[in-house]
C-alpha cells in the first residue's frame, strides 16, 4: 500500500474494509523488522518512581516501601525514655514549738539570764586604795574571777587617773568590763559576771561599801 493511500486511511478517506487492510500491513511490517530482543511492556502505572493511587490521586503520590527499604505500614514509635525517680531532698526534722526541745532551750536561756541578774553582791570585793601601789591587789582579785569595786575617793587626782587606766587595761586583757558606778567609784566585772542595773544602783548608794 502506498504512503498516499495510508494517509487517506488515516484521515478516514477510504472505505472501512481497506482500513483493516492497512492495519494488517502495519502488523506484518512490525513483525518483520522488529528486534526479537525488544519487548514492549504495558504502560507502567508508576510515575517518577511512585505508585499512582487507584481511583485518582488522593493526598499526592505515596512512596513505595520497597524503594526506600523501609516499612511504612508499621507505626513508628519513639523508644520510651527512662524516667528518673524523684526523691524529696533530705531536710532535718524540726521539732514543733511546743516540744520538749524548745522548752529545754528556753529554760537554759532563762537560767543564764537569772544567774546574771541575781548575782550575789556579797561576793563583790570593795577596795579603797590610797595609792597606786595597791593596784596589785586589785589585779589579783579580778584575775581570780571576783568582781571588784574601786572607791577612789581617798586618792589624789593623778594616782586615781593612773589606777583607772590600769583597771581599764586589766578588764580589756581578761575580756571583762569596767563601769562607772558613781563619782570616782568603778566596778570591774569578770567576763562571766553580769551585774543587774538594780544591783548597780544599790552599789552606788553605798550600801555594800566596806570601809573596814
From Swiss-Prot:
Which PANTHER family does the UniProt record give? CELL DIVISION PROTEIN SEPF (PTHR35798:SF1)
Where can this protein be found? Answer: Cytoplasm
Cite the Pfam families for this sequence: SepF
| Record protein name field | Cell division protein SepF
Gene3D superfamilies attached to this UniProt entry: SepF-like protein (3.30.110.150)
Protein purpose = Cell division protein that is part of the divisome complex and is recruited early to the Z-ring. Probably stimulates Z-ring formation, perhaps through the cross-linking of FtsZ protofilaments. Its function overlaps with FtsA.
* Quaternary structure annotation from Swiss-Prot or TrEMBL: Homodimer. Interacts with FtsZ.
Q: Name one GO cellular component term.
A: cytoplasm
Q: Which keywords appear in this protein's UniProt record, sorted alphabetically?
A: Cell cycle, Cell division, Cytoplasm, Septation
The record lists the membrane-crossing segments as none
Q: Where is the composition biased (Acidic residues)?
A: 64-73
Q: What is its main location?
A: cytoplasm
What's this protein's family per the entry?
Answer: Belongs to the SepF family.
What's a single GO BP term from this record? FtsZ-dependent cytokinesis
Note down the stretches annotated as region Disordered: 32-104
Origin, by domain of life?
A: Bacteria
Amino acid at each position: 500500500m502506498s504512503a498516499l493511500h495510508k494517509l487517506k486511511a488515516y484521515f478516514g478517506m477510504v472505505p472501512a474494509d481497506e482500513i483493516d487492510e492497512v492495519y494488517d500491513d502495519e502488523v506484518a511490517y512490525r513483525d518483520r523488522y522488529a528486534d526479537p530482543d525488544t519487548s514492549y511492556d504495558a504502560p507502567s502505572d508508576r510515575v517518577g518512581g511512585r505508585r499512582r493511587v487507584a481511583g485518582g490521586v488522593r493526598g499526592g503520590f505515596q512512596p513505595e516501601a520497597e524503594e526506600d527499604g523501609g516499612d511504612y505500614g508499621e507505626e513508628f514509635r519513639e523508644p520510651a525514655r527512662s524516667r528518673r525517680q524523684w526523691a524529696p531532698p533530705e531536710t532535718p526534722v524540726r521539732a514543733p514549738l511546743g516540744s520538749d526541745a524548745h522548752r529545754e532551750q528556753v529554760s537554759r536561756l532563762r537560767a543564764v539570764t537569772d544567774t546574771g541578774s541575781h548575782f550575789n553582791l556579797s561576793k563583790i570585793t570593795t577596795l579603797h586604795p590610797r595609792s597606786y601601789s595597791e593596784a596589785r591587789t586589785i589585779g589579783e582579785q579580778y584575775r581570780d574571777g571576783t568582781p571588784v569595786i574601786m572607791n577612789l575617793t581617798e586618792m589624789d587626782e593623778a594616782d586615781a587617773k593612773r589606777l583607772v587606766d590600769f583597771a581599764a587595761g586589766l578588764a580589756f586583757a581578761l575580756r571583762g568590763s569596767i563601769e562607772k558606778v558613781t563619782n570616782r567609784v568603778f566596778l570591774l566585772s569578770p567576763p562571766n559576771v553580769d551585774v543587774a542595773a538594780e544591783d548597780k544602783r544599790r552599789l552606788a548608794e553605798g550600801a555594800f561599801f566596806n570601809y573596814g
